[in-house]
């Protein structure tokens, strides 16, 4: 799973922060890594440096194998809060998406699984 993090011209690109975000993404989304080709993260300051309200935005786009991309957005007052909110959202969306594909009608059922008990 490839991870690309970018910022707009209004945010300073801090190497340590970017590295910590990459580590967090790899950790939280590890269970989906074999089903994703790429993650794109874009951080932006919509007010251009203003300090009022939730003007920092994080967009995470996940690219599942053989599926349409999935996008989430979160706005917050700090870069960390915007990122963590978006990470939580993408984790939930991917769990729902991949949970549905592996638990659909016609899938394996506990009723049809071989029993370990020999009577």
Report each predicted region and the residues it spans.
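N-terminal, polar/charged subdomain of small-to-medium soluble alpha/beta proteins
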Residues: 1-119
């Amino acid at each position: 799973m490839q991870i690309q993090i970018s910022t707009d011209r209004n945010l300073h690109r801090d190497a340590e922060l970017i590295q910590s975000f990459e580590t967090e993404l790899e950790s939280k989304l590890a269970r989906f890594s074999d089903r994703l080709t790429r993650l794109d993260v874009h951080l932006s300051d919509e007010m251009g440096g203003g300090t009022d309200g939730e003007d920092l935005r994080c967009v995470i786009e996940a690219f599942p194998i053989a599926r349409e991309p999935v996008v989430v957005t979160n706005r917050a007052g700090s870069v960390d809060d915007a990122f963590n909110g978006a990470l939580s959202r993408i984790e939930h969306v991917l769990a729902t998406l991949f949970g549905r594909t592996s638990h659909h009608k016609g899938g394996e059922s506990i009723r049809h699984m071989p029993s370990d008990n020999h009577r």
